[in-house]
Amino acid sequence: MKQIEMLEMQIKEFTTALDNSQTSINHMTVFSEICKTQPINSADLTIKLDMEKSTINRLLHSLSENGRGKVKAAKLIDIKMDMKDRRHRIISLTTKGKSLMDKMFGEKHDR
């Protein structure tokens, strides 16, 4: 499959899974990074993606079990407190998130 076709398929899978008109490329960027490096703490994610902490937090909440404000919860990630440093959160994929990762990137994607 050509790279552009692969990317189109990944975007379609992602936007279908979120079923939300509020989906942005930033949501997919954050989700993709979590897929590559999970579990990851929120501070490391902020550094790796070179995004503001507030932006990362907003995106994480919309990808999580809870959602926030008008954004429907996607239930793709789980956010837990980092017991080593309570200022940070540990992010990992839920079962639904792992299923989407497999659809987007294939079964052999690193977990």
Positions of predicted regions on the chain:
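Short, Lys/Arg-enriched N-terminal segment that forms or immediately precedes the first helix
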Residues: 4-20
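Residues within the DNA-recognition helix of helix-turn-helix
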Residues: 59
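C-terminal flanking helix
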Residues: 64-71
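Basic, amphipathic "hinge/linker" alpha-helix immediately C-terminal to the N-terminal HTH DNA-binding motif
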Residues: 83-102
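Alpha-helical linker/hinge and terminal dimerization helices associated
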Residues: 100, 104-111
